[in-house]
Amino acid sequence: MTFRHCVAVDLGASSGRVMLARYDSKHRTLTLREIHRFVNCLQKTDGFDTWDIDSLEKDIRLGLKKVCNEGILIDSIGIDTWGVDYVLLDKQGQRVGLPVSYRDNRTTGIMPQALVQIGKSEIYRRSGIQFLPFNTIYQLRALTKQQPELTAQVAHALLMPDYFSYRLTGEMNWEYTNATTTQLVNINTDDWDDTLLAWTGAKKSWFGRPSHPGNVIGDWICPQGNRIPVVAVASHDTASAVIASPLANKHSAYLSSGTWSLMGFESKKPYTTDEALAANITNEGGAEGRYRVLKNIMGLWLLQRVLKERRITDLPALIAQTEALPACRFLINPNDDRFINPDDMHAEIQAACRETDQPVPVSDAELARCIFDSLALLYADILHELANLRGEKFTQLHIVGGGCQNALLNQLCADACGIRVMAGPVEASTLGNIGIQLMTLDELNNIDDFRQVVSANYDLTTYIPNPDSEIARHVAQFQPKRQTKELCA
């Protein structure tokens, strides 16, 4: 068959999309077309910050039906989402409790309990995953301690992409790359860790053994009656984004830039040394036995909140105004946990500047300048940490995802990091999702083969570092700004 049509459902923490890919195996051309885009946002339900998963499912089905109604024969479907969040089901497959978001404050104070009762080094030795207060391990502990009446009703716990695949197919699956984000998967066995799971109060029977990307979960029956296979892709959106990152060689790092920024490198081995633990490095699972050695950075969430609070709709105009301002007048640590979900983001940023005896950003452009400069400096700091960890410097950084469209931030990143930045592709998570589907359909051999297709079909923009820039001169001075309460233990 010359042409393949695959559908990627890509859900981020702020938006979702259903994308149609058309692959010409003869000419190795790959095109994407957006079928349906929709908003994903938090809502308050019974005092909890929750996801409207019924609305998300409705939009997923709407997007799939739109493709089918065009008369296109879909070869496969794949779903990727953000990590750590889950849905509980009873024996009949009905939901138990609420789909609570990782940004909810129910996990406050939970992680320190684990550090005392299990031990930080022991948790890291078992999982190899960074300590973030909203990891699934702490969410489940919060659930079983705060709402014990729910646990007796639970028969299954599905992570978000597995839940939506279940809703389409009726079949349950626990995909490996996303499962590793829970901090509950043993890094040596690739299965759920008995000790860590027992501490949460959840039952191991709620989970099936994690499966690696590339298996067919089941079929979705389209309105026309055709059975379409739903493939378990690398269902953590960052895992999919990394698959589509055209990394040139082992000296290339990546930055998946969106609501979250995830910076790291690809490795055939995990890094679980004392040095890695001290730096709060994570070893998330990838496809083909690869590890995503990375760190989470709060990312454009700060900007998204400021845009919403101040009703800013013209982002290009804001960026143009921001670029005209002098650099590094206002600096914060974007990974300070005060920025996870404050009532008022711009007020929180202003307070952080005030508390460190800096000028206070007031205008929209000043707030954006603060965010962009601070992110770029944090990127440089973390890239240095990652290079020290592996014992080799990086020569190139690939920025993928929606954030790679921000030319100002890309240049600031290049200047601060002191290396060449390659920006693109924008829809990296979608492309990585499609890549696994094409491999499952035997159209491509492996990830390296797929990256060649991406490189041939998607243009990248190059940013050359300017060592004389203002932000480059501030790199060494940024360290004191990081002495804050970070997203770690």
Curated annotation (Swiss-Prot):
Coiled-coil annotated spans: none
Binding locations of substrate: 83, 236-238, 296
Active-site residues (renumbered): 237
Pathway it works in: Carbohydrate degradation; L-rhamnose degradation; glycerone phosphate from L-rhamnose: step 2/3
A GO biological process held by the record: rhamnose catabolic process
Role of this protein: Involved in the catabolism of L-rhamnose (6-deoxy-L-mannose). Catalyzes the transfer of the gamma-phosphate group from ATP to the 1-hydroxyl group of L-rhamnulose to yield L-rhamnulose 1-phosphate.
Protein name: Rhamnulokinase
Gene that this polypeptide is encoded by: rhaB
